[in-house]
Amino acid sequence: MIKEAENSIVIVTTEEGLKRKADVLAKYLRKAKERGVAIKISAPIKKETDEIKELRKVAEIKDLGLSARFCIVDNESVMFMLAHDADIHPSYDIGIWLNTKFFASALGQLFNLNWNTIKVKN
């Protein structure tokens, strides 16, 4: 999904998820940024780690107070996880990937309402 992004990437994750994604996705997010893709990440941030500092070079990062795990690409594709990562072993984690512009666009609009209007916590 992220490798194919043309316009936008939205990632909503947990604090631990952000740490894991920093290593795995950094290269792809950097390449997406170079292509002009707008990248927004929402995650609870208790401490500004080196991983978060690196991600801030390619993405806007805010703590919106959301408890969710999903990714929206170009308001056309959505990947969402069914459980909080603290509640499930990684090898049993389940995600659903949908290519539906209608749902992805609606979810993206809701996310952007929060992004643009809710007071940022960090």
Show the residue positions of the predicted features:
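Secondary-structure "cap/kink" motif recognition
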Residues: 1-8
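Short beta-strands and strand-loop turn motifs
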Residues: 11-13
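PLD/PLD-like phosphodiesterase catalytic module centered on the HKD motif
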Residues: 4, 15-122
